[in-house]
Amino acid sequence: GFRNPTSGAINLGRSGGRIAHVDNASAITQNPANLMDLKRPEVTVSFNPVYISVEHQNASGATAETENAWKFLPAAYASMPILDDKYVIGLGITSPYGLSNEWKNAGGFADTANQGSLRYTTPHFSELQTILVNPTVAFDVSEKVSMGLGLDIQWSQLTFKQHVFPNGRFVAESDGIGAGANR
């Protein structure tokens, strides 16, 4: 799928098991109430490399493989206690979804006539890009209970490229902005 792995080395090391308790500014996107555990301003920046390589072999033995296997997933989070530590405000900027898949112009995806058994059946390029901006605020409801609220503003762009019979090419692009919330 296009869901990106969890952000940051610490959270990756925890195998994504970070929703219940996060002890850094990346709590902004999953559990902003945890920001109340942070007693000083904090900035967390990550630039996670991801390697995705796919090889396909059909029933007749023809093969195809992807190119541009390295992807880079940036994320940045900042939080700061305010008003005598009664509130913590935060801002997260991440890419929660978005990877691409591009098949080499050879084998099953060759764009030469009468080659490429997959040429007309599936996109040879697909890409989903997203940017999530997530301002948050956290506060204590009682001595033992904290609450956090966040606004999710997400931009996305989707692109597909596919060969069309007999020698054409179809490109579809779409983008949009959505809003939501997290707590």
Feature locations, PLM:
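N-terminal, post-signal peptide beta-strand-biased segments of exported outer-membrane/organellar beta-barrel
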Residues: 1-97
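Transmembrane beta-barrel outer-membrane domains
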Residues: 23, 65-73, 124-130, 178-183
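Extracellular loop and loop/strand-boundary signature of outer-membrane beta-barrel proteins
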Residues: 59-64, 118-123, 170-182
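Transmembrane beta-barrel architecture of outer-membrane proteins
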Residues: 49-51, 72, 129-133, 153-155, ...
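Residue-level signature of outer-membrane beta-barrel architecture
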Residues: 36, 80-82, 139-140, 151-153
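Well-ordered mid-protein domain cores that form the structural environment of catalytic cofactors
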Residues: 92-133
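Outer-membrane beta-barrel translocator domains and adjoining extracellular loop/strand segments
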Residues: 54-61, 101-110, 116, 154, ...
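Membrane-spanning beta-strand positions in outer-membrane beta-barrel proteins
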Residues: 42-44, 86-88, 136, 140, ...
